[in-house]
Amino acid sequence: SWASFATGKNPGKTTIFDFLKRDPKTYMPDFAMNSVSQQQVLWGKWTSVIIAPSIGVILFLIIFFSLYFSQCTRMTLLVSSIGGTVAVCGGLLFLIDRYLPQERPVVINNRQGKTIWELSAEHGIKTRVIRFPNTFPPDHIEDGEILSGLGVPDIRGTMGTFSYYTTEHTAQSENTEMGGKVIQVTWTRNKIETIIYGPRNKLFKRPPSEINLPLRLEIIHNEANHAEVTPPLPSLRKGGINGEETKGLANPSSSQGVEKGGISSSDLVSVSKSLSLTLHVETKKESQAIFPTSQEEVKNGLKSITSPPSQGRGGGVEDATVHPHPNPPPSMGRESDTLSEHILPAPGGRGIRGGGAEPVPGNNEDIRLLKIETSGQTQVLKEGEWSDWLVLKFTFNPFVKMYGIARFHVISIEPLKLYLSPINFHPERPPLPISYPEHYAADIAKKIGLYKTLGWAIDTWALNEERINEEIFLDDTNFTINKEIEMLKEFLGKQDARLYIQLFEFTDRIQHMFWRFREEDHPAYDREKAEKYKDVIFESYKKMDEIVGMVMEKLDDKTVLFVCSDHGFNSFKKAVNYNTWLVKNKYMTLTNEGDTKEKTLEDLFGRGQFWPNVDWDNTKAYALGLGDIYINLQGREAYGAVRPGKQYEKLRDEIKEKLEAWVDAENGQKPVRRVYKREEVYKGFDPNHVPDLIIANNNGYRVSWQTSLGGIPKDLLEDNKKNWSADHCSLDPEITKGIFLSNMKFDVAEANIMDIFPTILQLLNIPVPDDIDGKVLK
């Protein structure tokens, strides 16, 4: 939906209708927000052939005339000239072929439509956009800045690959469903030698396929004051990483913190991401900024914005509706000028910084510490402690290097349980542009220290796979958000842009992971943990409200503030395997029904094998992404089995009717609330691109992770025992409404998320384009 916010167009026009798309010629899934292509470096495979002989000719002439004027014999002249030239040319051919790539990856932003920040910049309005989704690579805006958000990958090219090192050999090894790496290790004389998984080698065709780093771990005892040993890092630029001599692996000023927002609460109004827009128009991402005490207060006190079937998938939605309140709620936190360090209160009344660690013994007691060495840096940590940022240098060859940053958390030393966060691009040396101007990401780092650049900054995947616990997750959430608050404060201190947009998604991430503590009948409910964490969602809203209050405190009467979300939330108790449903209802045929290998995100980003046992010639439909069904259409799909026209329409009607009538035999509920035909949801779409049917689930049901990746598990429905316990993806937008708040009165009965685009343009006196779908709010 954020693409629709940015352009005023429906997802059919922006082409961002899901996190995933598919290639009809190969049936292969891919990331929808951006695509990776290859760009030739110099002359590609001919570079060495062109450069070496060219230099050879010049060298030959230099040697020849040097010897000629020194009156050498003809034979000496000829042999020396040719010999020297051949030797140098041969060496150049070898060096260029070995150390200079023929191609390099380039990223293409797939979002279509001109954005609000491009239009504002064209009209001379200073604009700043912070961590907005689908801004990677960033747009070029004159006299403005963009820091890319959701869509920026980690150093492995994924949405966030964490690593988990353990001596417990009962743990699942290798790749988890959500893309984590589980590395089983063994102590040898209190030492472990292992690796940090780095970037895939997409520059050179020769091995290695991945550029990894050695990692050395050692148990040490009685380390006085448990001091950190940190040899100086090579500076990434003169003056160090933060403008000073860099002494460790991290920026000493790294703060804990608060990050992104956007979600909602079950029976309350929902939200997912909230933005602050200043217009000076400001949009700031929030989740339910205020907490009504009843459903009636929700209806009377907030504008509620709904999204259609694509909502919450990274695209906008067509049917989003808002029920406005004439006045901005008075409780938006004007009294708070300073923010508490932690967004969420810790269970038991203590801070969450420790990540759940037990109290540390006194200096006279025998304590075990973990010494971590990698990339020329050393840190010594207690159990329950986070490392500072480590700057990781991945060397492809002496001339090609890639820099990343990551943090360790020591969960346990014996047995070893060591978590390594996804490796972010270093903001001062990203391999691809993550800001506009390109130096803007580095400028921010100079002011606030190192920060996360990964689009999906809060690691929900590790908590979902139970490699970290809730307190570690909240600790990292605080760390993340505080940095983003610092970015916001940078603007509020100067207010040097007329249009400011920033996205906070921490409320979204928290609600995904903590909803299970609100429902005793949820398959993932844990009574003991619920006592600690049942209020975390509400605390995240309070923190977002505090952020909004801080913004309002700084605004004058002429500045307009918008706070909005792109979706709400519903419970996720059961996962629906739609490809399995298609198989059981004879719409998909398998060559081997026993082959139900689980798919992982590593398969997606690593270009693994998909659909290995599907008989496409006898398959009518297939499911992929977050509730999308594609018809195996002749002339569009590579092995199309369904004729366009009457057969196509009859099949869509049949699948729609059966899915909407389907009843869960276990409880009598309907998993599917509605199935939309694409023309009911989108306008101006590419029929080769957009799914033919969009499934909208009822509360409690969601498309399974396996269906999203093209998997075909055995069972139709599965209890969701994962920590990811609530969602908006594949839920019917009619029951998944978000919010829209403003300090400006609007006299409208309903609104659409696309309406914000033209409304802001009008406030900025910019002509509204004719080809958009949104309407100006009055």
Give each language-model segment a name.
Residues 541-583, 587, 669-679, 684-686, ...:
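Metal-dependent active-site segment of extracytoplasmic phospho-/sulfohydrolases and closely related
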Residues 8-229, 248, 262-305, 340-341, ...:
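His/Asp/Glu-rich, glycine-adjacent segments
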Residues 235-240, 244, 256-261, 311-315, ...:
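Glycine-biased, low-complexity coil/linker segments
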Residues 578, 582-645, 722-764:
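Substrate-binding rim/cap in mid-to-C-terminal beta-strand-loop elements of soluble/periplasmic
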Residues 641-720:
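Acidic, glycine-rich loop-and-strand cores that form catalytic or ligand-binding grooves
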Residues 492-493, 500, 682-711, 720-770, ...:
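C-terminal substrate/ligand-recognition segments
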Residues 516-535, 713-721:
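A solvent-exposed, charged loop/short amphipathic helix patch at secondary-structure junctions
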Residues 138-141, 571, 575, 654, ...:
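Polar, surface-exposed loop/tail segments
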